[in-house]
Swiss-Prot record:
Organism: Arabidopsis thaliana (Mouse-ear cress)
Protein's GO biological process: maintenance of meristem identity; maintenance of root meristem identity; regulation of root development; regulation of root meristem growth
Protein family per UniProt: Belongs to the protein kinase superfamily. Ser/Thr protein kinase family.
Gene from which the chain derives: RGI3
Keyword annotations from UniProtKB, A to Z: ATP-binding, Cell membrane, Disulfide bond, Glycoprotein, Kinase, Leucine-rich repeat, Membrane, Nucleotide-binding, Phosphoprotein, Receptor, Repeat, Serine/threonine-protein kinase, Signal, Transferase, Transmembrane, Transmembrane helix, Ubl conjugation
Descriptive protein name: LRR receptor-like serine/threonine-protein kinase RGI3
Chief localisation class: membrane
Post-translational modification: Phosphorylated and ubiquitinated upon interaction with RGF1, thus leading to activation a subsequent degradation. Autophosphorylated.
Signal peptide span: 1-24
Keyword Ubl conjugation: yes
UniProt LRR repeat ranges: 33-56, 67-91, 92-115, 116-140, 142-166, 168-188, 190-213, 214-237, 239-261, 262-285, 287-309, 311-332, 333-357, 359-383, 385-405, 406-429, 431-453, 454-477, 478-501, 503-524, 525-548, 549-572, 574-596, 598-620, 621-644, 645-668, 669-690
């Protein structure tokens, strides 16, 4: 190569070398790539970010200003799995907008975020950021939008937030923030949106200064622990459109100044403890669209002025204490779509003017005192989908015009005094899924037109005076799942066409006058519950019964069925209860009955004509609790029954059994009435009474006395300690400033804080518990209150739980919370004073003597069962009590039970048809409850469910039956009550020996009840939660125990040979029993609570 050419080539290469930096990525791009390198990126989200580019301005998610400086970064919806890039991006001095949302970022927000002084928008929402909000953020004077919502941020909202004078939007919702809303919030004059809801530990009052935020459009503080009154300054928010502070702890009245919020469209204050009346000034809000005030403690009348809000489409005042009538002015609300006034004390009639609301879709006025007739002009409501008016005092006919509401999906008019027939036109409603008319005075026939209602899912017509036959057209209802037409005057046969109801699971036709054969009737295979009892059905039981493999309960008692029991019944593998009593069955009892392993509740074959011996396979019915084969012609011995370890009730009377009665404690303690009229049966003298307690060994007596002395001494020392502590606390209280108390009353009570404080002395202590000490205090009106003072001023969890739970539920067997008050040092709860103490004190304490007889004990445990069933099955979401024990069952003036102490109560987020899976794993809960009553899953830290309450209730049942505390020191070897009972039954000892000696001398029928209740208790205390019954099933079993042969005297039973008449019931009384449903944070969708 010539020298000149060589030199030219060299200098060209050298020139290119020195000019390479001019075409490389600038410092901003390198900073972005540095952050990118720290992320765990999947996919091609950053495929446009090339190192070969000279500038990042064309990269996805990056924008630059005119000078080529990065001004905006916007990245959303990627799984980056890294930390915030603040350190890496320090060079981006011109950054005005930083959006890093839904990127799965972790770690804390770095303090260096405050260095980006040009930022106007900072959005770090929907990540997994933790730690406190750094105060350095509030150095960003130009910030207009701050979105930190949906993270795991903790700590307080810094007072320095007031420095952001230009802030327009502040989004802090769905974090773990605590403390109070700082008063400096009032410095944000330009703020339009404030959302900080979903922070459960955000507490204190809404500061008065919030009224300074006059540009506010949206105020969202829902699902927090904000308490106290809404400040009157809220009336300064002239531009606010939505106020959402629901599911919190607000108290006091709604300020009249709310009427100055003239732009308000949505007011959501439900699920609080707001009291007073609904302000009439709300009627001046011409733009108001949604008004949700349900589940508070509002009183007084519904303001007629609300009829002046022309845009209103949703009103919900349910679960309050409202009185008066439904305002006629509501008829002016042409846009009204939903009116929900359930569970109040509203009286008067349904105003006809309401039918002018032609857009109405939901009309829910159930659980009130509404009288009169249903307006015939209901036909105007062509958009109506739900009409609930159950548990009122409505009279007259169901208007035929209701059938013109073509969109109706659910009608519930139960528990009224409606008469006349069911309009056949109702069944022309093709969208109707639920028709509930139970417990009225309806008559006439079920029209054949029912077959047109093809979407019907639930039908309840029970407790009326309906006559005629069941129309065969019912077979057209392919979606029908639940049918209850019991306690009417129906005649004729069960239509074979019912086999067409292929989705049917529950069929109850008991107490009618149905007749005819079952042979031609093929029942749907989907059935789980059948009750045809107390009718006049004849013929044999068809072999097809074995096709019902899902069946759990079959009751055919009190009919005229004959022939043999088909052996195919053994294929009903899920059967738990079988009642064929009081029929005309004959032949031998099939051996196949012993092949049904699930048969655990009851097997009743009494009052038939069975012959032969008890099948040998009956020895396999290990879980059976009740067996009744009385009033038959059975022979042989009873040895096959000796292995039934769970058997607590057996009636073999009026047969021809022979041989020796098995020599086991259970058989020795059977009442003679359950063995009577078996001529060949040899009954030894050992079947008489318990051993005389005076024959006990004297050393045992001395040991017992010693234990009692020691226990008494311990109790005295504990009492002294409690009284001293109470006196010291009382002295401290007297020094408190009266004006520092926050007070909320749910009932009208006339007293001052001083009236309470000065009486919190040791002389007034009536009890202590895990969460506090309880005093009896008489207020100036002469009324006595029970006042609970929480133990620890720092521990507010139990206090908040009790307010949250008891403040939102009402049930006849749950203690009533009258109000509460608190200050910095103390928290007090006010309850009705119940004069008879607790169930525990009556069973074990110095006050024992009342509530000792079985009848009173039964009423107590049934009442508690109703309370728990209400919490578990009527409340939405389900409420777990968490500390069911005899000490927490209080007794009223007539020993009526009240479940108390909800300091450990919690809700569970699972409910049928919500799409929430209860089986999904959750964080294991901490230990809770009381030792001796806790279910086994507490000790193993398994998931706590409502079945844990069932176990605790079972322990209470055993305590009531045996008279022994769960940790009674007299139990052998220091055993727990459940283990002692379980061992006793496993050893085949006489179950009646388990019963409280104070219950001795009761009649055979009462003894039978007690032993059946023992069987229920044994089911409840199963070690496996999934084997325990639901509380609604416990209620059903206990009710069934008491209702067997109710109303018939012993003399009548003996005259009838122990079996009832086979004649069908022709008439039933017009008098109806109406269950009192409590009000709560529960679904009041329907009046029925059947399985």
């Amino acid at each position: 190569m010539p020298p000149n050419i060589y030199r030219l080539s060299f200098f060209s290469s050298l020139l290119c070398f020195f000019f390479i930096p001019c075409f490389s990525l600038d410092q901003q791009g390198q900073a972005l790539l540095s952050w990118k390198s720290q992320l765990n990126i999947s996919g091609d989200a950053f495929s446009s970010w090339h190192v070969a580019d000279t500038s990042p301005c064309n990269w996805v998610g990056v924008k630059c200003n005119r000078r080529g400086e990065v001004s905006e970064i916007q990245l959303k919806g990627m799984d980056l799995q890294g930390s915030l890039p603040v350190t890496s991006l320090r060079s981006l001095k011109s950054l005005t907008s930083l959006t890093l949302s839904s990127l799965n970022l972790t770690g804390v927000i770095p303090k260096e975020i405050g260095d980006f002084t040009e930022l106007e928008l900072l959005d770090l929402s929907d990540n997994s950021l933790s730690g406190d909000i750094p105060v350095e953020i509030f150095r960003l004077k130009k910030l207009k939008t701050l979105s930190l919502n949906t993270n795991n941020l903790e700590g307080h909202i810094p007072m320095e937030i007031g420095n952001l004078s230009g802030l327009v939007e502040l989004m802090l919702f769905d974090n773990k923030l605590s403390g109070e809303i700082p008063r400096s919030i009032g410095e944000l004059k330009n703020l339009q949106v404030l959302r900080a809801g979903g922070n459960k530990n955000l507490r204190g009052e809404l500061p008065w200064e919030i009224g300074n935020c006059e540009n506010l459009v949206m105020l969202g503080l829902a699902e927090t622990s904000l308490s106290g009154k809404l400040p009157a300054s809220i009336g300064n928010l002239k531009r606010v459109q939505t106020i959402a502070i629901y599911t919190s702890l607000l108290s006091g009245p709604i300020p009249d100044e709310i009427g100055y919020c003239t732009e308000l469209q949505n007011l959501y204050l439900y699920q609080n403890s707001i009291s007073g009346s609904i302000p009439t000034t709300i009627g001046g809000l011409k733009k108001l669209q949604s008004l949700l005030l349900w589940q508070n403690n509002l009183v007084g009348k519904i303001p007629t002025e609300l009829g002046n809000c022309p845009e209103l489409w949703l009103i919900d005042f349910s679960e309050n204490l409202l009185t008066g009538t439904i305002p006629r002015s509501f008829g002016k609300l042409e846009n009204l779509q939903e009116l929900q006034l359930s569970v109040n004390q509203i009286s008067g009639t349904i105003p006809e003017e309401l039918t002018n609301c032609t857009k109405l879709t939901h009309l829910e006025i159930d659980n009130n005192l509404i009288t009169g007739e249903i307006p015939s002009l209901m036909s105007n409501l062509r958009s109506l989908t739900m009409f609930f008016a159950w548990q009122n005092k409505l009279t007259g006919n169901i208007p035929q015009s209701l059938s013109q509401c073509r969109e109706l999906q659910a009608i519930d008019l139960s528990y009224n005094s409606l008469s006349g027939s069911i309009p056949k036109e109702i069944f022309g409603l093709r969208n109707l899924t639920k028709l509930l008319l139970l417990s009225n005075d309806l008559s006439g026939f079920i029209p054949p037109d029912i077959g047109n209602c093809t979407n019907l899912y639930r039908l309840r017509l029970n407790g009326n005076r309906l006559a005629g036959s069941i129309p065969s057209e019912i077979g057209n209802l392919k979606n029908l799942n639940f049918v209850d037409i019991s306690e009417n005057r129906l005649v004729g046969s069960i239509p074979p066409a019912i086999s067409g109801c292929e989705s049917l699971e529950f069929l109850d036709l008991h107490t009618n006058s149905l007749s005819g054969s079952l042979l031609g009737t093929t029942l749907p295979k989907s059935l789980k519950f059948i009750d045809f009892s107390d009718n006049a059905l004849s013929s044999t039981l068809p072999p097809g019964i074995g096709l019902l493999t899902e069946l759990t309960k079959l009751n055919l008692a009190k009919n005229r069925l004959s022939g043999e029991i088909p052996r195919e019944i053994s294929t009903c593998r899920s059967l738990q209860l079988l009642n064929l009593g009081e029929n005309d069955f004959s032949g031998e009892i099939p051996d196949e009955l012993g092949q049904i392993p699930s048969l655990a509740i009851s097997l009743n074959l009494s009052c038939n004509r069975f012959v032969g011996e008890i099948p040998s396979r009956f020895s396999d019915l290990k879980n059976l609790g009740v067996l009744d084969v009385s009033h038959n012609q059975l022979t042989g011995n009873l040895n096959v029954l000796t292995d039934l370890q769970n058997l607590v009730s057996l009636n073999i009377s009026y047969n021809d059994f022979s041989g020796d009665l098995p020599n086991t404690p259970f058989f020795r303690r059977l009442p003679l009435s359950d063995l009577a009229s078996n001529r060949g049966l040899y009954i030894s003298n050992a079947i008489s009474t318990r051993p005389d307690p005076t024959t006990r060994n004297s050393s045992v007596v001395r040991l017992t006395i010693l234990i009692l002395v020691v226990v008494t001494a311990v109790l005295v020392l504990m009492a002294v300690y409690t009284l001293v502590r109470a006196r010291a606390a009382g002295k401290q209280l007297l020094g408190e400033e009266i004006d520092s108390w926050e007070v909320t009353l749910y009932q009208k009570l006339d007293f001052s804080i001083d009236d309470i404080v000065k009486n919190l002395t040791s002389a007034n202590v009536i009890g202590t518990g895990s969460s506090g000490v309880v005093y009896r205090i008489t207020i100036p009106s002469g009324e006595s209150l029970a006042v609970k003072k929480m133990w620890s001023k720092e521990e507010s969890g139990a206090f908040n739980s009790e307010i949250k739970t008891l403040g939102s539920i009402r049930h006849r067997n749950i203690v009533r919370l009258l109000g509460w008050c608190s200050n910095r040092n103390l928290k007090l709860l006010f309850y009705d004073y119940l004069p008879n103490g607790s169930l525990s004190s009556r069973l074990h304490g110095a006050g024992k003597g009342g509530c000792v007889d079985w009848e009173a004990r039964y009423d107590v445990v049934l009442g508690v069962a109703h309370a728990l069933a209400y919490l578990h099955h009527d409340c939405l979401p389900t409420i777990i009590h968490g500390d069911v024990k005899a000490m927490n069952v209080l007794l009223g003036p007539h020993f009526e039970p009240y479940l108390a102490d909800f300091g450990l109560a919690r809700t569970i987020s699972g409910y049928p048809n919500t799409g929430i899976d209860l089986a999904k794993p959750t964080n294991r809960p901490p230990m809770a409850g009381s030792y001796g009553y806790m279910a086994p899953e507490h000790a193993s830290m398994q998931r706590i469910t409502e079945k844990s309450d069932v176990y605790s209730y079972g322990v209470v049942l055993l305590e009531v039956l045996t008279g022994k505390h769960p940790l009674d020191p007299d139990l052998p070897g220091g055993a727990h009550l459940v283990k002692w009972v379980r061992d006793h039954l496993a050893e085949k000892k006489d179950p009646s020996r388990l019963l409280d000696p104070r219950l001795d001398g009761r009649t055979d029928s009462i003894m039978h009840e007690m032993l059946q209740t023992l069987a229920v208790a044994f089911l409840c205390v199963s070690n496996k939660a999934n084997e325990r019954p639901l509380m609604k099933d416990v209620v059903a079993m206990l009710t069934e125990i008491r209702h067997i042969d109710v109303g018939r005297s012993e003399t009548e039973k003996i005259k009838a040979g122990g079996c009832g008449s086979k004649e069908p019931q022709q008439f039933m009384s017009n008098e109806k029993i109406i269950n009192s449903h409590g009000s709560s944070n529960c679904s009041f969708a329907f009046s029925d609570d059947s399985v």
